[in-house]
Amino acid sequence: MYSATASNTFFLLSCFLLFCLLSAPSCVSMFSGIETGDLEKRDDLFPQILRDEAVARLYELGKVSDASGYLERTFLSPASMKAIDLIRKWMEDAGLRTWVDQMGNVHGRVDGANENAEALLIGSHMDTVVDAGMFDGSLGIVSAISAVKAMHVNGKLQKLKRPVEVIAFSDEEGVRFQTTFLGSGAIAGILPGTTLEISDKREVMIKDFLKENSMDITEESLLKLKYDPKSVWGYVEVHIEQGPVLEQVGFPLGVVKGIAGQTRLKVTVRGSQGHAGTVPMSMRQDPMAAAAEQIVVLESLCKHPEEYLSYDGHCSDSTVKSLSSSLVCTVGEISTWPSASNVIPGQVTYTVDIRAIDDLGREAVIYDLSKQIYQICDKRSVSCIIEHKHDAGAVICDSDLSSQLKSAAYSALKKMEGDIQDEVPTLMSGAGHDAMAISHLTKVGMLFVRCRGGISHSPQEHVLDNDVWAAGLATLSFLENLS
């Protein structure tokens, strides 16, 4: 029987759908992605290259893994070497001249109409975290190659006003050697010679690992990988947002105005190893208990920095306010020795990841945290060592590049949707990107692409096919209007 309640529900639903269709283009975009209609018939939108082929390549690259059942592709692993060959083949298919440098970065270059002009660098990273999604990093590489291929197909590639170089960076995540930006850092010239001496958990040094992969490198040759700043015009990176903002506002693309600074610490706490059943609680020097207390202090400090730092003398009111909105802290890895259920650990090691837009505020947090870590160790009669594994200052994206990317994104979305009532959003990035390293070499700009649920560093990471298309079309528009 058809009830009055069902009738009312149907009427309300019909009104809502009619409202979406008539007055809110972003509503349609929010729920179902960009409506394509007859767009596939338009040659200037290159759906076969910028969407179909690009998506197929992302899925193909997503299967190149060192693990069975999940995606793991770390710095110059066997899977990474396969990815290098695959990416290089795609670059050559797009009309690019290719090579691989001594840090495992894949380069594809076209000189355009003026080979002596400053070059645009565009790219992202090909390595992944453990149990990764397939869009992080890879989307920026594939969208750049696809845009270049579209220009190659329509005969515009050699007419570029300046050289364009697509780069797939070998290591951004820093999974194996616990130090990020090995690939882009080499290009930017920010890696000290001692970088080659860094060891992984098996005590294999970077220089020996590179040699095993036929990339014999010395401190001198590492320095030679740095690009001459006078030869580079700028750097652009397309990347999934890794957050929920674009999905919430119903926009496929957004322009990044800045990237949070980041510090990685390694904390080692040493105590007295003993039998779990025979050492009285009052006589223990337990590094696990000390580490647990330190981690709780870290959480409190990062949740409420105003309570810890306002009267410290290190922070102004504006810095504390900035920290309250941007500070995030994470303990992502803990290990114990000897790691047995019936043994009081002799040593506990954990990592700390601290990020904030305000560099002075981030440094104040590190200062306060370090002070409290040592106080807890003294109180519990254990020893502590704090190592700084990585430091990267916050980066503000170039205003001119950002403006050009915003225009390119608007142009792409207008071609696909027909009408855009709202402005392309701008947002900050809490995640680190290769653009941070390259900012030491040249001006940088970034374009974010919406991802489902804001999920990243997870197999659940997902980007709509048409959003991949929008990213490629925006990149193409940017290249076509390159000054």
Curated annotation (Swiss-Prot):
Instruction: State how the cofactor is bound.
Output: Binds 2 manganese ions per subunit.
Q: Which Gene3D superfamilies match?
A: 3.30.70.360, Zn peptidases
Tissue expression per record? Expressed in roots, stems and leaves. Not detected in nodules.
According to the record, what induces this protein's expression?
Answer: Not regulated during water-deficit stress.
- Explain what switches its activity on or off, per the activity regulation comment: Inhibited by borate, fluoride, L-Asn and L-Asp.
What SUPFAM superfamilies does this protein map onto?
A: Bacterial exopeptidase dimerisation domain, Zn-dependent exopeptidases
Q: Which GO MF term does the entry hold, naming one?
A: allantoate deiminase activity
Instruction: Please provide, in alphabetical order, the Gene Ontology terms of the cellular component aspect for this entry.
Output: endoplasmic reticulum
> What quaternary arrangement does the UniProt entry report?
Homodimer.
> What is the designated name of this protein?
Allantoate deiminase 1
Q: Which reaction does it catalyse?
A: allantoate + H2O + 2 H(+) = (S)-2-ureidoglycine + NH4(+) + CO2
Keyword presence, Manganese: yes
Q: Which family does it belong to?
A: Belongs to the peptidase M20A family.
Q: Which residues are the signal sequence here?
A: 1-30
Which species is this UniProt entry from?
A: Glycine max (Soybean)
Pfam families found in the cross-reference section = M20_dimer, Peptidase_M20
Q: Where in the cell is it found?
A: Endoplasmic reticulum
Q: What EC number(s) does its UniProt record assign? A: 3.5.3.9
Which InterPro entries does the protein's record reference? Amidase_Cbmase (IPR010158), ArgE/DapE_CS (IPR001261), Bact_exopeptidase_dim_dom (IPR036264), Peptidase_M20 (IPR002933), Peptidase_M20_dimer (IPR011650)
Domain of life, per UniProt, equals Eukaryota
Q: Which cofactor does it need?
A: Mn(2+)
